[in-house]
């Protein structure tokens, strides 16, 4: 079984690794298509996609392609690889009909479709306080995440997970699911999506990290969803790090400092309260909340803003 893999971030790298290291010798990854290396960090140094890095660091004999678009000659390159399947996991590009015609294109999407079509399904699961997390394999068509569902898997939330932890758990679950889909493809009954039930999610931007002290639960969920980037910050760009939900019932002044101790600062919201362990001002290193407040001479009864 010849597989062309299309994927870019760490989530996709987990899936690629599972395909490459699978004990079933029938699976052969014959090519990786991924995004171009992009500037990263303050120094804007070029950083390779995690999928590419995995192949290079492990000295795997898998050709790597980083095309700007999927037109000619890329379509011919794909044809020459003679794939039995094209597997797509967080690739970041739309596949044109010329590519879809080469071989069955299977997309592993991190949601229970038709829920959360689009670029940020794992963020949306967290932000919407979902009780069930899941993942789907889908036969791709020309529309965004709208193809027939092949298989799905899910689990009941036992505790709150931040983006990194949930992504990793879903990636490992997705790897198992994808291997099942590839093995059983010919016998799987495809399930058309109910497009009336579809919901959509957008690409996350820096502005999504802006928070206030109106609703404690919402602030807490954003801290989980945006942990890696863009993080969460107030209007003055003060970052709130390591946020815990204390309660979501009582009413307080917005941003009122209720308590200060070694664990952090307890801050009131119009609904509920949160405990913040560390704070980071613009251009400064993160500080324990207590030390930051002492430096600003903020005490219980004051307003964190």
Write out the residue ranges for each language-model feature.
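N-terminal Rossmann-like dinucleotide-binding module
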Residues: 1-42
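A residue-level signal for conserved active-site and pocket-lining positions in enzyme catalytic cores
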Residues: 7, 32, 55, 86, ...
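Active-site-proximal loop/hinge segments within enzyme catalytic domains
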Residues: 10, 142-246
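Conserved beta-strand segments of alpha/beta enzyme cores
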Residues: 28, 61-63, 104, 239
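Conserved beta-strand termini and adjacent loop/short-helix elements that scaffold enzyme active sites
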Residues: 35, 65-67, 140, 152, ...
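N-terminal beta-loop-helix "entrance" segment that forms/cooperates
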Residues: 38-57
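Internal anion-binding site segments
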Residues: 195-305
């Amino acid at each position: 079984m010849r597989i062309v893999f299309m994927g870019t971030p760490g989530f996709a790298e987990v899936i690629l690794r599972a395909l490459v290291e699978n004990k079933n010798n029938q699976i052969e990854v014959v090519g990786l298509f991924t995004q171009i290396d992009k500037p990263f960090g303050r120094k804007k140094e070029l950083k390779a996609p995690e999928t590419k890095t995995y192949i290079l660091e492990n000295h795997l004999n898998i050709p790597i392609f980083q095309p700007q678009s999927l037109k000619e000659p890329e379509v011919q390159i794909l044809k020459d690889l003679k794939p039995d399947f094209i597997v797509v996991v967080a690739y970041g590009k739309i596949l044109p009909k010329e590519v879809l015609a080469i071989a069955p294109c299977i997309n592993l999407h991190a949601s229970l479709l038709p829920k959360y079509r689009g670029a940020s399904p794992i963020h949306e699961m967290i932000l919407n306080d979902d009780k069930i997390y899941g993942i789907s394999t889908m036969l791709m068509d020309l529309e965004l995440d709208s193809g027939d569902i092949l298989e799905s898997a899910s689990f009941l939330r036992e505790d709150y997970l931040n983006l990194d932890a949930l992504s990793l758990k879903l990636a490992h679950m997705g790897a198992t699911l994808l291997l099942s889909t590839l093995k059983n493809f010919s016998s799987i009954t495809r399930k058309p999506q109910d497009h009336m039930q579809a919901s959509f999610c957008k690409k996350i931007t820096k502005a999504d990290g802006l928070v206030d002290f109106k609703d404690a639960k919402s602030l807490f969920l954003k801290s989980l969803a945006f942990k890696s980037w863009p993080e969460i910050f107030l209007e003055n760009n003060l970052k709130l790090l390591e946020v815990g939900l204390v309660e979501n019932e009582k009413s307080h002044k917005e941003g009122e400092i209720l308590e200060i101790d070694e664990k952090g600062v307890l801050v009131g919201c119009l609904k509920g309260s949160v405990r913040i362990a560390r704070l980071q001002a613009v251009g400064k290193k993160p500080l324990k909340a207590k030390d930051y407040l002492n430096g600003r001479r903020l005490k219980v009864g004051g307003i964190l803003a």
